[in-house]
């Protein structure tokens, strides 16, 4: 059920049960808050030392709230208003911890609306009775003419001109606020009334007091509503103008009343509001309406422009660093195995190094007969295969290579190769396996390996052949003896 309908029914109930409007307002606020935030009340009732209990709710409140929740479209709950203890309602309002944050602002707004409505109604009724012009005035109009300028002005404005008509003329205006207009204060331009005199107030300003400006009448209070202020009064509309609500105030300002529009124009909700509002002496201050000078034009709500946080997830490659050789070219790269091989054209090198299976990332570089294997985060172990340079029978040959990122030049020839291993304890450098050997040395070493394999194969064959010969050497006699034993 709409809140406005609840308010209307509550007002009718107030008339029926002789309650004051202030008491009805308090009841409306409690009912609306209980219906919207029932969980808060239940939680508070179970909070120790809160002093609040659902059993101590004012009489009739829970019955009405239960009926509202069960049948929100049923108006019969208003019959329960006679059971409400209104004095207890006022006491209960101040007991809850959200009184100042939720309940009090609602009460102040409703009380302000009540004060404004009653004040404006009184003013408009007094002026309406005195504003009908005398038919014997000096102005003459043709027969059957209508009075084209009549007004309802607030008590502080003076009706300067009231057009008259002869005895046959009919006064068709002298308006009061129609009941269908949803305006906080009275006096809008009456239906079918024509105001031919100068209409004061443009679409960007509002008159804070309730008045329909007659010809030459002085608008005693004008204001420019700042943003987020509540505009509670209505103001003038000139001929054939349609009074539209929410005429002034951008964004979050709440326009309670209908306000001014110039001739045949509609005041729209997007009309600009200027600062430096001027308020005359007879402006009526209405509760939370803040019409102040040099007020901020726009009430911008804090729009959370949430920063787009981009998380860049990069699949890091191997953390190893290769020993940068001359003119190095990446021959292949595999992120799965985390291994990259770079080769600088060696002397027909056939050296192959297999990285350890426990290595987290491996870089194998073969450069000019030198094989370097580097592994991250392992104990530093340097395995070096070098040539035996003791032989001087051959003419030295020039060999250039890289040893652990350092260019190495030698002028020797290798007759034999020998392997040596040295171990150092250092976790800050990479594991490096270096083979320094020229092509002649590598070829000789390869030939030695092949030779050893050949010899091993020969021994195996000889053993097999010997075993075969031994079996055959046993001869038929041994077989005959075995056969005889079996028999």
Curated annotation (Swiss-Prot):
Induction: Induced during anaerobic growth. Induced by cold shock.
Residues with lipidation of kind GPI-anchor amidated asparagine: 465
Region feature (Disordered): 206-299
Disulfide bond entries: none
Domain of life: Eukaryota
Record PTM text: The GPI-anchor is attached to the protein in the endoplasmic reticulum and serves to target the protein to the cell surface. There, the glucosamine-inositol phospholipid moiety is cleaved off and the GPI-modified mannoprotein is covalently attached via its lipidless GPI glycan remnant to the 1,6-beta-glucan of the outer cell wall layer.
Any one Gene Ontology BP term: fungal-type cell wall organization
GO cellular component: cell periphery; extracellular region; fungal-type cell wall; fungal-type vacuole; side of membrane
Stored InterPro entries: SRP1_TIP1, Yeast_SRP1/TIP1_CWP
Pfam families, A to Z: SRP1_TIP1
Lipid bilayer topology: Lipid-anchor; GPI-anchor
Region (11 X 12 AA approximate tandem repeats, Ser-rich): 137-268
Record function comment: Component of the cell wall. Required for anaerobic growth.
Assigned protein family: Belongs to the SRP1/TIP1 family.
Record's comment describing the protein's domains: The number of the intragenic tandem repeats varies between different S.cerevisiae strains.
Name the record gives this protein: Cell wall protein TIR4
Native source organism of the sequence: Saccharomyces cerevisiae (strain ATCC 204508 / S288c)
Annotated gene: TIR4
